[in-house]
Amino acid sequence: MKRITSYRKNAICLLASLSLGSFLVACSTTQPNYQTVGNLNNLNQLQNLHAKATPSKKQMTGLHAQALQDIAMSIGAQAGLAWRSEQINQVLSKNASNLDRIFNFNLILLDHNVVPPVLVQGNSSLNLADAQTLRIDDRAYQIISQAHFITAPPQWRNYIWMDYQHPELPLPAFLPKTAEERIIWKKYATIGWQDGVQQADAIFNDNLARLTRDYNGMALYRRLLLKGMVSKPFVAQTDLGITGNNSALHINDQLLRITSLPKLQINPGRWKSIVTHDSAPTKE
């Protein structure tokens, strides 16, 4: 009978470990009536986060240690991401005026609140179709994002502002309570923190690259448009006059649709000769 009871108890704990929160509540060596000590404002405070310590009544199990590691790494990663995001945002705020000048989307918007397409340019590319075919070009252009309507001009903040909040403090039942548990917590919270900081840097770098690509790609479209190497989007306008019902009234109601998206002009006979500092090909 004792063996059956012991077997059932172990099975319950094993199943509960599939859910991290359930495991810590069901299989903890102590009751979850503790007070959280510390906060998540910096790495040192994170490392020393714990519940008010009580004497350990039994040796910590491997499953409990693994659960503690998982929570420490998860909380550490979220806290590190939020901390690094705040640092990045402080730098962005100090340089806001310069960024407003560099990434001024108002200068490249099209009529009718249309955002230009994003183009990318490649130079001197080689493409090997097969062992007997090699394709060479001096320059290549590609539309990677098409024109579309917006209600407000894009801003650099839409791309690179880091909006990551600090995680909530975990319940005391999920925190280390003994010296042995605090050693585990400190080690894996530090690993999680470092991962979170690296993740924040990676996210920012990716977003900055996307901002630069989109802005330069829209500016490239405007230059090629002047040369006749790409077409404008065609916007059809329908005047609806006065519309509405007993609850809403719309005066001079208009409906706009993009009926033709920009296309690259592959006929060089339609390119225009213009004076430009850009080295893109023009018709002579």
Predicted segment positions?
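N-terminal Sec/ER secretory leader and immediately downstream segment
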Residues: 30-156
